[in-house]
Every structure is written in structure tokens, then in C-alpha cells.
Amino acid sequence: MSVPTITYENFEGDPFIDSISTDDATKGAYEILEWAYRTYGDSIVYSCSFGAESMVLIDLIYQIKPDAQIVFLDTDLHFQETYDLIDRVKEHFPKLRIEMKKPDLTLEEQADKYNPALWKNNPNQCCYIRKIKPLEEVLGGAVAWVSGLRRDQSPTRANTNFINKDERFKSVKVCPLIYWTEDEVWDYIKKHDLPYNALHDQHYPSIGCIPCTAPVFDSEDSRAGRWSNFDKTECGLHVADKP
């Protein structure tokens, strides 16, 4: 299927959602990524959390573009297990270009300017400073970006398409794994012997910053452990999208 270059400005909907075959082993993910990197080249960025879905995407992307650019939003509040995983990924996929993108403010500067525990008193502001604003800077020179969202992760992600108009970042967001289940993600990881975050084996299905991540027990919502004391399940990177 020949699809013209899709930009934020000319976006008219996802051309793949009703036409691409999801019967292959990757449920359309490989074909979507092939199209994305062929279309956008170095103008597409993968914003990677290094969660379970990330490992699947990294493996697929590496087959298509081994020197792809991957950006990790390093808030300075991540678990040591996450940093350990990044080191293992660098060894496993040596050609990847991994950028550790930090916020403008250090934790000390943020504490002096706002609050010593801003994530507790105003988590939305903390997420903006340490995640959203840094990604805005990264995507300033990118036409599109890749995300590992799955439809079954949470109600806020249930309507995600392969190709999305991203109102938050005025960009195109490519989500190849929308039809994957959690079991399929883990089957792929185990089948291909991919590295993954050790915290996943300790009841952490979704892993973010230390203060805002808790283990999950007996819950169908994989994001139940994120901001568990607040009416909040998203950091803000994905909430402004319009399919």
C-alpha cells in the first residue's frame, strides 16, 4: 500500500487502521515501522520508556534501522533497575543511538523553585518539568515519533490508532503495537531472549519514576501502580491525542 508522507498539518486519519493485515506474527507492527522509517528516516524519533513494550519495539526497529534514534526521558528519578536495563540494551543493540534527555532543572533546583517533593504535591507539574517539556524539545525537530501504546493497557489508550495526530506535541505519533496483548509482548520477549527490567518480575507491570510507581497485585489495569494516590494514570505525554 502506497501512503504519502503524513504530517501534523496534512493529517486526515490513519490510512492503515482498516487496510493493514494484522494476521502476521507482529500484528502489523513490522509493516508500520517499515513504512515509518522509510517515510521519515532520521526525522522520526522513538521516545522509549524501556518497559516491556519497548523491548519488542527496539528489537523490531533494529531489524529495520539499526542506527535508529531512541530518546529516554531521564528524570533523575528512575529505578536503578531501569538504568541497568539501558546498559544491557546498549550491549544487545550496539548500533542504536540512545540519547538520555534530562530536564532543564536538576532535582535540587526544582526543590528550591517549587517544592522538595513536587511529585507528591503537584504531580502534573512535576511530569511537565521532567518529562513533557524535555520531549517537546526533542520533538521540535522531528516530524513523527514512535510510542509503544497498546489499546488494552488502560481506558485512556483504548482508541489509539497506528497513526495518530498528536495534539500535545503537534506531531504524528506512530503506535505499532496497538493490537498486542500483554501476553503477546512477553511471549515475544521470551522467544527472542530479549533483556527486560528486573522489576517486571516483582509485580511492576508499568515502571516510571520511583516516587510515582508501586507494585500491582490482582488488578486488570497494568497502570494501576502509577500515581496510585492520585486520580491520574498518565504523565501527560499521551492525553491530548486525537485519532
Swiss-Prot record:
Q: Does the keyword NADP apply?
A: no
Which Gene3D superfamilies does this entry report, sorted A to Z?
Answer: HUPs
Primary localization: cytoplasm
Swiss-Prot/TrEMBL GO biological process terms: cysteine biosynthetic process; hydrogen sulfide biosynthetic process; sulfate assimilation, phosphoadenylyl sulfate reduction by phosphoadenylyl-sulfate reductase (thioredoxin)
Q: Name one GO cellular component term.
A: cytoplasm
- Which reaction is recorded as catalysed by this protein? [thioredoxin]-disulfide + sulfite + AMP + 2 H(+) = adenosine 5'-phosphosulfate + [thioredoxin]-dithiol
- The protein's enzyme class: oxidoreductase
Cross-referenced InterPro entries: APS_reductase, PAPS/APS_Rdtase, PAPS_reduct_dom, Rossmann-like_a/b/a_fold
PANTHER family referenced in this protein's UniProt entry, alphabetically? PHOSPHOADENOSINE PHOSPHOSULFATE REDUCTASE (PTHR46509:SF1)
Q: Which HAMAP family match?
A: CysH
Biological role stated in the UniProt entry: Catalyzes the formation of sulfite from adenosine 5'-phosphosulfate (APS) using thioredoxin as an electron donor.
What is the protein name stated in its UniProt record?
Answer: Adenosine 5'-phosphosulfate reductase
